[in-house]
Amino acid sequence: MTVIDAPRTLDPVTLEVIRNALPAISDEMSFDLQRTSYNMMIYEVRDYCTALLDTQGRLISQNIGGVSHFVADLGVVIKDGIQRFGLDGFAPGDVILHNHQAVAGQHLNNMVCYTPFFHDGELLGFAVVRAHWVDIGGQSTGFGAGGTAYDPWSEGLQIDQLKIYEAGVVDRKLLKLIRDNIRYPDAAMGDLRSQMAACRLGERRFTELVERYGRDTVLRSIDTIYRETEQKCRGVVAEIPDGVYSAESFLDAASGRYDIKVKVTISGSDMEIDLSGCSPQREGGMNSRTFAGAHIAYKALTVPLEPVNEGSFAGLRVVIPEGNMMMARYPVMMASWSGALPTVVDTVWRALADALPQRIPAAHSGSLGATFVFFGYDPRRDRRFVVQSIESGGWGGRPTEDGESVSMSVCQGDVRNAPIENIELKNPILVLERALRQDSGGPGKFRGGLGINTRAQALVPGRWAAGGGGGRVNCPPWGLWGGQPGKIAETLIKGPADAEFRRSESPRYIGDAGSEVIHRTAGGGGWGDPLERDPARVLVDVQEGYISAQSALDDYGVVLTPDLARVDLEATAKLRAHRSILRR
């Protein structure tokens, strides 16, 4: 795409039509992918994004609800492809695959498929789909090889900017190589065809837009949209008091503790997020190469309700040195690449809590969800199977309202858990419980949202991936302004002959038929003093089962009648006054 430096007058009506048409193209790509994909992680969980990028690797548009941490650095892959092939090295009919960690910086399941689009022989940009493949080979299946991997090659098949179609001609040998090295080739090839179809649709729709309004008008509109988006974001940042703000937290994993230290600098309309204080890379899968955590925190703070494009991040500078856990040097394992991102976002917001006390929420569950994975061989159907889902947690209380319960991480867009009926229909597994986790939300004037309990039983022997908290099992979602932390996540396992559940310390567990796993996701932190919560809201929480009567008494100082029908206002006032005195 030609860079247009000098803005010329655009018809404002046409500009608005194009402004809305671009994300509509990405949305249509998304709908096409969702309807035609083979694996549940795409068509049910929606673990993907669809996007258009220009010939500089800048983001033109993404689908509404696309996985945030997929899109935030998608341009890195396209820029690498441009450097590899040159702008003259792309032809109509090309289809390129890429998941190599040295560039993509994620676990290998997140496969990027992209195609170039042209008008009158000129390359104008790329249609891109990044989607979670159910398997990519390696030592294990599921969400990457997890705790069983010992180097990046044991995590799976690395594909580095390979053209599986060149000028419309398929490379069948390359496709066979991919099929022969993954466990579920039919699903993977079906998903690949879905990704290709979505990209082709994006090509057609963008070309139609150019044919209707003209090349120059569309390209100038895109540049204008970039500039206007940047200006809106900068306008919000300019309202934050200048200064240097810092905060820290941590993650825990089998490979040890990871420090998350953040420094945010505000200078006028510029924001810098410095992650230099985070732990260095190390063995273990919680490494990545991504700016996504910083980008997501910035987008949510500025114009969260508007479509994202390259201008959304133009006012942000991110500092991450090479060798940092967020900018790990290849070769290094990245199976749990995204585990740190929600905590990075929370910690950036925590740093700004003093500057924006009426905007910043308490910490959310801080995890990408308990990894509900079970895989093996189903003798009843004579096939291998894998069950993958994501269990959501609680969001932090806000300055004016409670946190949302059982919601996905801020990093995950519209990702959702898989329906139980579909899980059980297609796999030898029985889901015995999926329910709100009582008392998991942090007490506060505005309570943290609740996590969820999910209990599942194997109907055949297999392997569980029992990763419960995404690295936040010892770092509870913190409260703000007197709010209390939410409960941490945990995973419990039980064999068919065991009388009781026991805590799982391993990310993998070999289970016989009848074995069970319970995932308990974290709740969000509370916002404000729990003793200031309206007693009537505490009563409703007890009656709805969100909190116990004991929590009402112990955490909120609210005395209920024995039948839990009313608040004893006199006893409540006395108890709260007494506790306030004890705090002095």
Give names to the regions the model predicted:
Residues 2-92, 100-119, 123-584:
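Glycine/proline-enriched, intrinsically flexible loops and inter-domain linkers
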Residues 95:
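Glycine-rich phosphate-binding loop of nucleotide-binding enzymes
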